Amino acid sequence: MKVLVVVDAQNDFITGSLGSLEAERVLPNIVNKIRDFDDLIVCTIDTHFENYLETQEGKKLPIKHCVRETEGWRIEDRIEVMSMLYKHMLTVEKESFGSFFLPQLIENYTIGTTIEEIELVGYVLDICVISNALLLKAYFPETKIAVDVSCCSATSPEAFEASKIILKSCQVEIRGE
């Protein structure tokens, strides 16, 4: 079995408070990747609360985003529609860059099967995508972990390139270059 992890494909990361033209540019690639994928898909949902600016993350990144139940928190419409049509799409909320529950959810859902690979796409490569890729690599050390960078955006072009270097050095395969 293969697993596709779609990281934080939420309105605030695409067109909202943390959105960018680059994030909008890669969205069709993510939609196509989901459409063409036949196995398990898991979407992470970055989730914050009204007190976000008082948190450690909020003090270092003082841009309110992905506040639970707001429009910015919601999964982007095209991906949301696909999740309704796709019978093997799970979601997991996370309150930090990486989700401790993501590896456990994947493991529990795939009991009795062999995971051939886990591929990640989404937002933001140098923060949440890299955090989840490394969590998954630590949890599943003998499973191929890959990131399709044609389906990712980052906080800057420099951060994008640095993330690829770090991921490669941690034995995460880079695709879509």
Spans of model-derived segments:
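Short, well-ordered secondary-structure micro-motifs
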Residues: 53-55, 102-104, 131-132, 158-159
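Short phosphate-binding/catalytic loops that engage adenosine nucleotides
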Residues: 141, 172
